[in-house]
Amino acid sequence: MIKIERTSVMNFENAIRGARNPLNSWDRMDSSYDENGNFILGENDLGLAKRLAHAGSDHRKFLRQIFVSVDITAPLYWWKEFDTYKVGTVANSCSTMHKIHAKSFERDDFSCDRLDEGGLAALDALVAYLENERVKFCEDKTNKQAWHNMIQLLPSSYNQMRTVTLNYENLINIYYARKNHKLAEWHTLCDWIEALPYAKDIVLVKEKSEM
């Protein structure tokens, strides 16, 4: 399970202007904002962006200046893979260390959409145990054993929300590394990438021969 919310794409105008710095071609900028405040690439700017994006990472530095902020709720097992992307990404997460006891444990707190009946039964038993330990800890905050039981038994299917900041160059790397991954969560993220502004022009840039 993965939930992607509150997407915000920023700094298109400045990134495109910077892309024109090497040739001092600012007078050819033809982009504008629509009535909803969305940045619309003009024909000249879109052509430049596509040429640079397809020319390789050395030529498309402007993509590193197009920022994306998004809230992602996903299981810990997925976050372990996402954390391999360190360069150009920032993430603030909800804290399990400080807030694990703040709400009741429920099945919906875990990614279990692919479990069979036996797996769900095992998860339900663990959820009941975790909830029992949570109640113990809430009644007596000095009961460190109950807290340790929660922390060390929390399964990797536990869902955590993080606010993530990336850039379009990150998204190229993520998309082509993960679009055929066995985890369904990556497929959902890749679908989200495809739907971002101008992604089909400047993010989905690798030819089949390069993949």
Regions found by a protein language model. Give the residues of each.
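Family-specific signature for flavin-dependent thymidylate synthase
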Residues: M1-M211
